[in-house]
Protein backbone atom coordinates (compact mmCIF):
# COMPACT_ATOMS: atom_id res chain seq x y z
CA UNK A 1 0.00 0.00 0.00
CA UNK A 2 1.88 3.03 -1.25
CA UNK A 3 1.29 6.70 -1.23
CA UNK A 4 0.69 9.93 -3.03
CA UNK A 5 3.07 12.86 -3.50
CA UNK A 6 4.82 14.54 -0.58
CA UNK A 7 2.20 15.66 1.94
CA UNK A 8 1.61 19.34 2.50
CA UNK A 9 -1.49 19.09 4.66
CA UNK A 10 -2.20 16.86 7.63
CA UNK A 11 -5.34 15.29 6.21
CA UNK A 12 -4.06 14.02 2.88
CA UNK A 13 -4.90 10.35 2.26
CA UNK A 14 -2.61 8.03 0.34
CA UNK A 15 -4.40 6.21 -2.43
CA UNK A 16 -2.04 5.80 -5.38
CA UNK A 17 0.92 3.48 -5.79
CA UNK A 18 3.66 6.08 -6.38
CA UNK A 19 5.38 7.38 -3.25
CA UNK A 20 7.39 10.55 -2.89
CA UNK A 21 10.78 10.26 -1.23
CA UNK A 22 13.05 13.19 -0.44
CA UNK A 23 16.39 13.50 1.27
CA UNK A 24 16.17 15.98 4.13
CA UNK A 25 18.68 17.48 6.56
CA UNK A 26 19.93 14.59 8.70
CA UNK A 27 21.52 16.94 11.22
CA UNK A 28 18.14 17.86 12.69
CA UNK A 29 17.73 14.35 14.12
CA UNK A 30 19.80 14.09 17.28
CA UNK A 31 19.99 11.93 20.38
CA UNK A 32 21.46 12.38 23.84
CA UNK A 33 23.16 9.48 25.57
CA UNK A 34 21.82 8.63 29.03
CA UNK A 35 23.36 6.21 31.52
CA UNK A 36 21.02 6.78 34.45
CA UNK A 37 17.46 7.24 35.65
CA UNK A 38 16.08 9.09 38.66
CA UNK A 39 17.36 6.34 40.96
CA UNK A 40 20.99 6.49 39.85
CA UNK A 41 23.38 5.12 37.24
CA UNK A 42 22.11 2.02 35.46
CA UNK A 43 25.51 0.38 36.05
CA UNK A 44 25.36 0.97 39.81
CA UNK A 45 21.77 -0.19 40.10
CA UNK A 46 22.54 -3.34 38.11
CA UNK A 47 25.63 -4.01 40.22
CA UNK A 48 23.41 -3.78 43.28
CA UNK A 49 21.05 -6.37 41.84
CA UNK A 50 24.03 -8.59 40.99
CA UNK A 51 24.80 -8.70 44.70
CA UNK A 52 21.34 -10.14 45.34
CA UNK A 53 20.65 -12.34 42.32
CA UNK A 54 22.29 -14.93 40.08
CA UNK A 55 23.64 -13.28 36.95
CA UNK A 56 23.50 -15.13 33.60
CA UNK A 57 24.02 -14.19 29.96
CA UNK A 58 21.94 -14.76 26.84
CA UNK A 59 23.82 -17.97 26.07
CA UNK A 60 22.53 -19.49 29.31
CA UNK A 61 18.96 -18.41 28.56
CA UNK A 62 19.05 -19.86 25.05
CA UNK A 63 20.34 -23.11 26.54
CA UNK A 64 17.41 -23.13 28.99
CA UNK A 65 14.40 -22.94 26.66
CA UNK A 66 11.11 -24.34 27.96
CA UNK A 67 8.63 -24.10 25.08
CA UNK A 68 8.51 -25.74 21.67
CA UNK A 69 7.57 -23.89 18.49
CA UNK A 70 5.93 -25.46 15.44
CA UNK A 71 8.02 -25.71 12.28
CA UNK A 72 6.44 -24.21 9.15
CA UNK A 73 6.73 -26.45 6.12
CA UNK A 74 5.15 -23.83 3.87
CA UNK A 75 4.38 -20.12 3.80
CA UNK A 76 1.95 -18.76 6.41
CA UNK A 77 -1.38 -17.53 4.97
CA UNK A 78 -0.72 -14.75 2.42
CA UNK A 79 3.11 -14.71 2.48
CA UNK A 80 5.10 -15.39 -0.70
CA UNK A 81 8.78 -16.07 -1.46
CA UNK A 82 8.94 -18.24 1.67
CA UNK A 83 12.22 -19.64 2.99
CA UNK A 84 11.70 -20.90 6.55
CA UNK A 85 9.84 -20.17 9.77
CA UNK A 86 7.76 -21.31 12.72
CA UNK A 87 4.56 -20.72 14.67
CA UNK A 88 4.37 -20.27 18.44
CA UNK A 89 2.97 -23.00 20.69
CA UNK A 90 -0.79 -23.12 21.22
CA UNK A 91 -0.71 -20.95 24.33
CA UNK A 92 1.30 -18.14 22.77
CA UNK A 93 -0.67 -18.43 19.54
CA UNK A 94 -3.93 -17.85 21.41
CA UNK A 95 -3.00 -15.42 24.19
CA UNK A 96 -4.70 -12.05 23.69
CA UNK A 97 -2.91 -9.91 26.28
CA UNK A 98 0.62 -10.44 24.90
CA UNK A 99 1.26 -9.30 21.31
CA UNK A 100 4.49 -9.93 19.33
CA UNK A 101 6.11 -6.97 17.58
CA UNK A 102 9.88 -6.76 17.07
CA UNK A 103 12.28 -9.28 15.57
CA UNK A 104 16.05 -9.61 15.28
CA UNK A 105 18.41 -12.55 14.81
CA UNK A 106 21.96 -13.65 15.50
CA UNK A 107 22.67 -12.63 11.88
CA UNK A 108 22.21 -9.08 13.17
CA UNK A 109 24.30 -9.75 16.25
CA UNK A 110 27.31 -11.16 14.39
CA UNK A 111 28.26 -11.07 10.74
CA UNK A 112 28.50 -14.84 10.37
CA UNK A 113 25.04 -15.31 11.87
CA UNK A 114 26.16 -17.51 14.76
CA UNK A 115 25.84 -16.96 18.50
CA UNK A 116 27.74 -16.46 20.73
CA UNK A 117 30.79 -14.89 19.09
CA UNK A 118 32.92 -17.84 18.01
CA UNK A 119 30.05 -20.24 18.72
CA UNK A 120 27.75 -22.36 16.59
CA UNK A 121 24.24 -21.40 17.74
CA UNK A 122 21.47 -19.83 15.67
CA UNK A 123 19.00 -17.64 17.52
CA UNK A 124 16.14 -15.18 17.11
CA UNK A 125 14.72 -12.62 19.52
CA UNK A 126 11.11 -11.37 19.46
CA UNK A 127 9.55 -8.60 21.58
CA UNK A 128 5.97 -8.63 22.91
CA UNK A 129 3.92 -5.94 24.66
CA UNK A 130 1.22 -6.47 27.28
CA UNK A 131 -2.30 -5.10 26.76
CA UNK A 132 -5.14 -6.00 29.09
CA UNK A 133 -7.26 -3.21 30.54
CA UNK A 134 -8.48 -5.48 33.34
CA UNK A 135 -5.02 -6.44 34.63
CA UNK A 136 -1.78 -4.89 35.86
CA UNK A 137 0.35 -3.86 32.88
CA UNK A 138 3.23 -6.35 32.78
CA UNK A 139 5.18 -4.31 30.26
CA UNK A 140 7.41 -5.93 27.67
CA UNK A 141 8.79 -9.41 27.34
CA UNK A 142 11.51 -10.75 25.07
CA UNK A 143 11.54 -14.23 23.57
CA UNK A 144 14.84 -16.06 23.07
CA UNK A 145 14.43 -18.64 20.29
CA UNK A 146 16.97 -21.42 19.79
CA UNK A 147 16.83 -21.96 16.02
CA UNK A 148 19.85 -24.26 15.78
CA UNK A 149 17.43 -27.02 14.76
CA UNK A 150 15.02 -25.30 12.38
CA UNK A 151 12.71 -28.31 12.33
CA UNK A 152 12.14 -28.08 16.08
CA UNK A 153 12.78 -24.57 17.45
CA UNK A 154 12.49 -24.02 21.19
CA UNK A 155 12.15 -20.79 23.14
CA UNK A 156 11.79 -18.99 26.47
CA UNK A 157 10.26 -15.64 27.43
CA UNK A 158 12.08 -13.20 29.74
CA UNK A 159 10.87 -9.89 31.16
CA UNK A 160 12.45 -6.56 30.24
CA UNK A 161 12.92 -4.39 33.33
CA UNK A 162 14.38 -1.09 34.44
CA UNK A 163 16.57 -1.16 37.58
CA UNK A 164 15.30 1.08 40.40
CA UNK A 165 15.50 1.60 44.16
CA UNK A 166 12.62 1.05 46.57
CA UNK A 167 11.45 3.75 48.97
CA UNK A 168 13.48 2.00 51.67
CA UNK A 169 16.69 2.03 49.63
CA UNK A 170 16.64 -1.57 48.38
CA UNK A 171 17.69 -2.53 44.86
CA UNK A 172 14.75 -3.56 42.70
CA UNK A 173 13.34 -3.29 39.18
CA UNK A 174 10.15 -2.24 37.43
CA UNK A 175 8.48 -3.53 34.25
CA UNK A 176 9.09 -1.51 31.09
CA UNK A 177 5.64 -0.54 29.85
CA UNK A 178 6.37 0.21 26.21
CA UNK A 179 5.14 -0.99 22.83
CA UNK A 180 8.58 -2.36 21.80
CA UNK A 181 7.61 -2.20 18.13
CA UNK A 182 11.13 -2.87 16.88
CA UNK A 183 14.32 -4.45 18.20
CA UNK A 184 17.89 -4.85 16.95
CA UNK A 185 20.59 -7.20 18.27
CA UNK A 186 24.16 -5.96 17.73
CA UNK A 187 26.95 -7.82 19.48
CA UNK A 188 26.08 -7.97 23.17
CA UNK A 189 23.57 -5.11 22.95
CA UNK A 190 19.85 -5.16 22.27
CA UNK A 191 18.28 -1.91 21.01
CA UNK A 192 14.55 -1.47 21.65
CA UNK A 193 12.55 1.44 20.25
CA UNK A 194 10.75 3.68 22.74
CA UNK A 195 8.02 5.15 20.52
CA UNK A 196 7.90 8.68 21.88
CA UNK A 197 11.39 9.05 23.34
CA UNK A 198 14.17 7.24 21.46
CA UNK A 199 16.04 4.01 22.10
CA UNK A 200 16.48 1.79 25.14
CA UNK A 201 19.54 -0.44 25.31
CA UNK A 202 20.03 -3.76 27.11
CA UNK A 203 23.23 -5.72 27.71
CA UNK A 204 22.66 -9.36 26.82
CA UNK A 205 25.63 -10.34 28.96
CA UNK A 206 23.64 -9.33 32.05
CA UNK A 207 20.37 -11.04 32.89
CA UNK A 208 19.21 -12.17 36.33
CA UNK A 209 17.51 -15.34 37.46
CA UNK A 210 14.55 -14.67 39.76
CA UNK A 211 11.92 -16.62 41.67
CA UNK A 212 8.83 -17.69 39.72
CA UNK A 213 6.10 -18.47 42.27
CA UNK A 214 4.50 -15.00 42.21
CA UNK A 215 3.03 -14.26 38.78
CA UNK A 216 1.61 -10.85 39.76
CA UNK A 217 4.77 -9.40 41.33
CA UNK A 218 7.67 -7.60 39.64
CA UNK A 219 10.80 -6.66 41.58
CA UNK A 220 11.57 -7.08 45.28
CA UNK A 221 8.61 -8.60 47.12
CA UNK A 222 7.66 -8.40 50.79
CA UNK A 223 8.92 -11.99 51.23
CA UNK A 224 12.45 -10.85 50.37
CA UNK A 225 12.53 -12.58 46.98
CA UNK A 226 12.67 -11.01 43.52
CA UNK A 227 10.06 -11.85 40.89
CA UNK A 228 9.41 -11.07 37.25
CA UNK A 229 5.69 -11.87 36.89
CA UNK A 230 6.49 -15.58 36.91
CA UNK A 231 9.28 -15.45 34.34
CA UNK A 232 12.55 -17.12 35.33
CA UNK A 233 14.80 -14.39 33.94
CA UNK A 234 14.74 -10.60 33.76
CA UNK A 235 16.83 -8.40 31.46
CA UNK A 236 17.63 -4.96 32.95
CA UNK A 237 18.07 -1.80 30.89
CA UNK A 238 21.69 -0.65 30.70
CA UNK A 239 21.53 2.57 28.66
CA UNK A 240 19.28 4.94 26.71
CA UNK A 241 19.40 7.36 23.81
CA UNK A 242 16.85 10.16 24.19
CA UNK A 243 15.52 12.14 21.25
CA UNK A 244 16.66 15.79 21.39
CA UNK A 245 16.09 17.08 17.86
CA UNK A 246 13.16 17.09 15.46
CA UNK A 247 10.36 14.82 16.66
CA UNK A 248 10.64 11.23 15.51
CA UNK A 249 8.20 8.40 16.11
CA UNK A 250 10.47 5.45 16.90
CA UNK A 251 8.29 2.68 15.46
CA UNK A 252 10.76 0.14 14.09
CA UNK A 253 14.51 -0.36 13.90
CA UNK A 254 16.82 -2.32 11.63
CA UNK A 255 20.53 -3.00 11.22
CA UNK A 256 22.42 -2.14 8.03
CA UNK A 257 25.63 -4.17 7.62
CA UNK A 258 25.99 -3.00 4.00
CA UNK A 259 26.76 0.58 5.04
CA UNK A 260 30.20 1.83 6.07
CA UNK A 261 30.32 1.86 9.02
CA UNK A 262 27.49 -0.39 10.17
CA UNK A 263 24.41 1.65 10.98
CA UNK A 264 20.89 1.45 12.34
CA UNK A 265 17.77 2.84 10.73
CA UNK A 266 14.50 3.88 12.36
CA UNK A 267 11.14 4.15 10.59
CA UNK A 268 7.83 5.79 11.52
CA UNK A 269 4.29 4.42 11.50
CA UNK A 270 1.39 6.50 10.23
CA UNK A 271 -2.20 5.44 9.74
CA UNK A 272 -2.84 7.54 6.64
CA UNK A 273 0.56 8.91 5.68
CA UNK A 274 0.67 11.62 8.37
CA UNK A 275 2.71 10.83 11.49
CA UNK A 276 0.82 11.54 14.72
CA UNK A 277 2.91 13.53 17.23
CA UNK A 278 -0.01 14.51 19.46
CA UNK A 279 0.97 12.35 22.42
CA UNK A 280 2.35 14.47 25.26
CA UNK A 281 5.12 11.92 25.85
CA UNK A 282 7.09 12.91 22.74
CA UNK A 283 10.44 14.53 23.54
CA UNK A 284 12.60 16.69 21.30
CA UNK A 285 12.82 20.33 20.24
CA UNK A 286 9.19 20.54 19.09
CA UNK A 287 9.88 20.60 15.34
CA UNK A 288 7.61 18.29 13.35
CA UNK A 289 7.85 16.82 9.85
CA UNK A 290 4.66 14.82 9.49
CA UNK A 291 5.63 12.76 6.45
CA UNK A 292 6.93 9.32 7.52
CA UNK A 293 10.70 9.07 7.61
CA UNK A 294 13.60 6.63 7.63
CA UNK A 295 16.48 8.01 9.71
CA UNK A 296 19.97 6.52 10.07
CA UNK A 297 22.63 6.60 12.81
CA UNK A 298 26.13 5.14 12.45
CA UNK A 299 27.32 2.43 14.82
CA UNK A 300 30.70 1.69 16.38
CA UNK A 301 31.39 -2.03 16.06
CA UNK A 302 34.10 -1.90 18.75
CA UNK A 303 31.68 -1.19 21.60
CA UNK A 304 28.36 -1.72 19.73
CA UNK A 305 27.10 1.74 20.66
CA UNK A 306 26.20 4.71 18.47
CA UNK A 307 29.22 6.21 16.74
CA UNK A 308 27.55 9.61 16.58
CA UNK A 309 24.51 11.11 18.26
CA UNK A 310 23.63 12.97 15.07
CA UNK A 311 21.88 11.18 12.23
CA UNK A 312 23.84 10.65 9.01
CA UNK A 313 20.86 10.18 6.68
CA UNK A 314 17.18 11.10 6.73
CA UNK A 315 14.61 10.54 3.99
CA UNK A 316 10.87 11.10 3.83
CA UNK A 317 8.60 8.53 2.21
CA UNK A 318 4.85 9.08 1.91
CA UNK A 319 3.94 5.51 2.76
CA UNK A 320 1.25 4.67 5.26
CA UNK A 321 1.23 1.81 7.80
CA UNK A 322 4.98 1.14 7.90
CA UNK A 323 5.59 -1.53 10.55
CA UNK A 324 9.22 -2.49 9.94
CA UNK A 325 12.40 -1.34 8.20
CA UNK A 326 15.78 -2.71 7.16
CA UNK A 327 18.27 -1.06 4.84
CA UNK A 328 21.14 -2.09 2.59
CA UNK A 329 22.96 1.15 1.91
CA UNK A 330 20.58 3.44 0.03
CA UNK A 331 18.03 0.67 -0.52
CA UNK A 332 15.32 0.48 2.13
CA UNK A 333 12.84 -2.34 2.75
CA UNK A 334 9.52 -1.64 4.48
CA UNK A 335 6.86 -3.96 5.86
CA UNK A 336 3.42 -2.48 5.27
CA UNK A 337 0.37 -3.85 7.08
CA UNK A 338 -3.31 -3.72 6.16
CA UNK A 339 -5.34 -4.86 9.14
CA UNK A 340 -6.45 -8.20 10.57
CA UNK A 341 -7.76 -9.81 7.38
CA UNK A 342 -5.67 -8.46 4.49
CA UNK A 343 -2.16 -9.41 3.39
CA UNK A 344 0.88 -7.38 4.27
CA UNK A 345 3.47 -6.25 1.73
CA UNK A 346 7.24 -6.03 1.62
CA UNK A 347 8.09 -2.85 -0.28
CA UNK A 348 11.37 -1.19 -1.19
CA UNK A 349 12.61 2.23 -2.25
CA UNK A 350 15.93 3.95 -2.82
CA UNK A 351 16.93 7.11 -0.97
CA UNK A 352 15.66 10.08 -2.96
CA UNK A 353 13.52 8.05 -5.35
CA UNK A 354 9.87 8.85 -5.96
CA UNK A 355 8.32 5.36 -5.93
CA UNK A 356 8.18 2.29 -3.74
CA UNK A 357 8.13 -1.13 -5.34
CA UNK A 358 6.35 -4.21 -4.04
CA UNK A 359 8.80 -7.07 -3.44
CA UNK A 360 6.35 -9.74 -2.29
CA UNK A 361 3.28 -10.34 -0.15
CA UNK A 362 3.79 -10.79 3.57
CA UNK A 363 1.56 -12.55 6.05
CA UNK A 364 -1.45 -10.87 7.64
CA UNK A 365 -0.43 -8.66 10.55
CA UNK A 366 3.18 -8.17 9.45
CA UNK A 367 5.35 -6.27 11.91
CA UNK A 368 9.11 -5.72 12.30
CA UNK A 369 11.84 -6.87 9.87
CA UNK A 370 15.38 -8.25 10.16
CA UNK A 371 17.78 -8.70 7.22
CA UNK A 372 19.77 -11.94 6.96
CA UNK A 373 22.50 -11.79 4.32
CA UNK A 374 23.49 -14.83 2.27
CA UNK A 375 27.02 -13.71 3.14
CA UNK A 376 26.52 -14.83 6.75
CA UNK A 377 29.04 -17.64 6.47
CA UNK A 378 28.01 -19.57 9.57
CA UNK A 379 24.24 -19.43 9.13
CA UNK A 380 23.65 -18.81 5.46
CA UNK A 381 20.76 -19.38 3.11
CA UNK A 382 21.32 -19.75 -0.62
CA UNK A 383 20.12 -16.17 -1.00
CA UNK A 384 19.53 -13.28 1.37
CA UNK A 385 16.29 -13.36 3.33
CA UNK A 386 14.25 -10.95 5.43
CA UNK A 387 12.67 -12.13 8.67
CA UNK A 388 9.22 -10.94 9.72
CA UNK A 389 6.98 -11.44 12.75
CA UNK A 390 3.18 -11.21 12.72
CA UNK A 391 1.00 -10.01 15.58
CA UNK A 392 -2.62 -11.21 15.54
CA UNK A 393 -3.64 -14.04 17.85
CA UNK A 394 -4.37 -17.25 15.97
CA UNK A 395 -2.14 -16.28 13.04
CA UNK A 396 1.20 -15.52 14.70
CA UNK A 397 4.27 -16.53 12.72
CA UNK A 398 7.98 -15.85 12.55
CA UNK A 399 9.27 -16.49 9.07
CA UNK A 400 11.76 -15.44 6.40
CA UNK A 401 11.13 -14.47 2.78
CA UNK A 402 13.60 -14.10 -0.07
CA UNK A 403 14.85 -10.52 -0.12
CA UNK A 404 14.41 -10.30 -3.88
CA UNK A 405 10.87 -11.69 -3.72
CA UNK A 406 11.67 -14.73 -5.87
Regions found by a protein language model. Give the residues of each.
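Surface-exposed loop and turn segments in beta-propeller and other repeat-based domains
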Residues: 54, 58-96, 153-174, 214-249, ...
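Structural signature of eukaryotic scaffold interfaces centered on beta-propeller domains
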Residues: 93-120, 175-186, 245-263, 318, ...
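Short beta-strand elements that form the blades of beta-propeller/WD-repeat-like
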Residues: 122-128, 189-193, 262-268, 326, ...
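Beta-propeller blade signature
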Residues: 137-150, 202-222, 279-302, 343-354, ...
